[in-house]
């Protein structure tokens, strides 16, 4: 029987102090403009906080309001993919009661039950809120806090910085957030920007696969045997998932293959000279393209291709001339992808991001997940307890049926529910 969801309230949380008129217009960078208007969505599951429901809500409301003073663009409204009007209209906050124990959600291997904890209609951004929060209460006393942040104001790193600052403000009343809001100071605003060509589909399913630490080490050893030096966890897991996705695509296409491209978002903060701090907020990333011919399906070669494509991001200058040239190169690649001659896959890694440090005052989360995506052929990687990696994979139904039964994949990963 499906869990019953009951809405308790819906309101808007505004900054506790008004944003100065001098900060009213927050210009989008070229990266902000290029990103499709979607939400970055995360849900954090906790056992019973051990305090009254009204106190939890008051604590979250007050701390969010104070945090928004420093993250003032998050409480504004997007204007014509050009800038954010920092008008303090606020963040949408929904509170619901889910009539089932939290364990009923965590035991699922599909995304259906998990999706209950996310606000309705957050597959694409609302015009009325760049951030949407949903507080979920369960029969057992446990709670889940879902946070959806528009990709127009932050990438994954910036979104998690905001959530951790909010949690720290709730936990320690003296905490003062100190985000570095980059706006268009690093990546200049462009008059004409091509969006990343996401492929949306209503026939997608999302499954989560967990790679234990020991199996990741086996994958790394396999890559080393083929000549790849010091492969990373993300490189080997991504390569295996990509290989299995290509095999699933071929099995559903009468054994025929098409050229494909893997688009990876690369966090530029550590690569820039000088590097940007973790509290930098904006879309501070570039796109890594790995184009694969139809006969290049072996894991070692895929891992090597991913490494080679990433090397170009070493020791980047923050000079405008460099970024302009990169945007021109990116624009040409996007034009090729928009021809429809490639199968396009996407991968975003949130590994090593402090998602399990989000403590609102009642302990760290027992489980963190993301929402079912409507972007087909999408892979999101996230750390899981015990040095594991959780992969949230979104494919069309027929392709997923082949993918989730791939023996190679299942020899390293499990179709998994939360512990």
From Swiss-Prot:
For molecular function, the Gene Ontology terms on record are: acyltransferase activity; acyltransferase activity, transferring groups other than amino-acyl groups
- Give a brief account of the activity's temperature dependence: Optimum temperature is 32-37 degrees Celsius.
Give the enzyme's EC designation: 2.3.1.322
Keyword vocabulary terms for this entry = Acyltransferase, Alkaloid metabolism, Cytoplasm, Nucleus, Transferase
Q: Where does this one sit in the cell?
A: Cytoplasm; Nucleus
| pH dependence, record text | Optimum pH is 6.
Signal peptide per UniProt: none
What enzyme category does the UniProt record give?
A: transferase
What InterPro entries does the entry give? CAT-like_dom_sf
Reaction equations catalysed: rhazimol + acetyl-CoA = akuammiline + CoA + H(+)
**What role does this protein play?**
Acyltransferase involved in the biosynthesis of akuammilan monoterpene indole alkaloids (MIAs) natural products, components with various biological properties such as antidiabetic, antibacterial, anti-inflammatory, anticancer, and antimalarial activities. Catalyzes the conversion of rhazimol to akuammiline.
Q: How does it assemble?
A: Monomer.
Q: Could you identify this protein by its name?
A: Akuammiline synthase 1
Q: Which organism is it from?
A: Alstonia scholaris (Dogbane)
Q: Which gene underlies this protein?
A: AKS1
